Structure formats: C-alpha cells, structure tokens
Amino acid sequence: MLENDIKKVLYSEEDIILKTKELGAKLTADYAGKNPLLVGVLKGSVPFMAELLKHIDTHVEIDFMVVSSYHGGTTSSGEVKILKDVDTNIEGRDVIFIEDIIDTGRTLKYLRDMFKYRQANSVKVATLFDKPEGRLVDIDADYVCYDIPNEFIVGFGLDYAENYRNLPYVGVLKEEIYSK
C-alpha cells in the first residue's frame, strides 16, 4: 500500500544497513575509550540510531531530544522549538547528534550552538542523509552516510505528515501526495 505513494526507491534497507555499519566502525575508532553521548533527534532518528547502535563497539550513552522546525509541512518553518530536552548533563561530554536528515541546517546549528554554550567537550553531527542543496545556514555534518538530491524523501524514519517512517527503505514521495 505505502509503496504505491513512492516514485522511486533511492536506498534499500540493505544499502542503509551497509552504510550504517561503516559509520559504526568509524565512530568506534574515533571514540574508543571516550564514552560519548549519542543524542537522537526524535522522531526521525529512531530507525537510524537503533541500527547504528548495533555497529558501535565501544561504550556509549544515549539520550533523546524532540526538536521541531517543520510543524507538519514539507518545508522548514525556520523556527526551532525544543519540545523535549536531554536528561543528561552534557558539560564536559563528547556529544554526537544523530539525525535522519540535514536539510536547511537550522535545527542542527541551533543544537550545536546550544550544546557548546552548555560546555560540551565536543559536539559532532552524524546523519543518515545530507541534503546540501537545502542548506540555509553554515553547518556541515561530521559523519554522513549519503548525500542526497533536493527531493522529498520518506522512509527509515523520514516522514511526511507523520507517515511513511515505517518503510524499511528510503524513497522519493510522489509529488501528488504532498501537493494535495
């Protein structure tokens, strides 16, 4: 049923798992013995973070934030709202934000600046997808699985109006679905 709304599949579940394994190995090497705090940005990061955790072979702690800049549409509102903050004291910690996608960059820039102000030792960003064409602020991810074209994608945590997150792959949503 859901697949009928997909114009084309960009990345299969197998593709995503392979890239996530590679990223897990990189984070293992970069953070061995450091016990970083991985902060998942909800809701979209859940499938990616769950898969990534399986492939990190060093001690890590996890926490979550709910941050919004979309409010249900297909374009960012420009206003970043923190709906749920982390429970962990991040002072002196190495923090890695786990994101499903970086588009405008506003959310991650806001979070990175906020955590630096809170005196995190380091603040890095790991994302499943980076959409550089959508960038409106100067921020780059430190770890990127895929650079993607400026298309509206869904699946593996990415949504349109809270739907399609449960697709095991990532595909381009048909325009007639989101232009209604």
From Swiss-Prot:
It comes from the Bacteria. This is Hypoxanthine-guanine phosphoribosyltransferase. The keyword Magnesium applies. Diphosphate binds at K43, G44, R165. The gene is hpt. It comes from Streptococcus agalactiae serotype V (strain ATCC BAA-611 / 2603 V/R). One of its GO terms (cellular component) is cytosol. Its cofactor is Mg(2+). GMP binds at K131, F152, I153, D159. Mg(2+) binds at E99, D100. Belongs to the purine/pyrimidine phosphoribosyltransferase family.
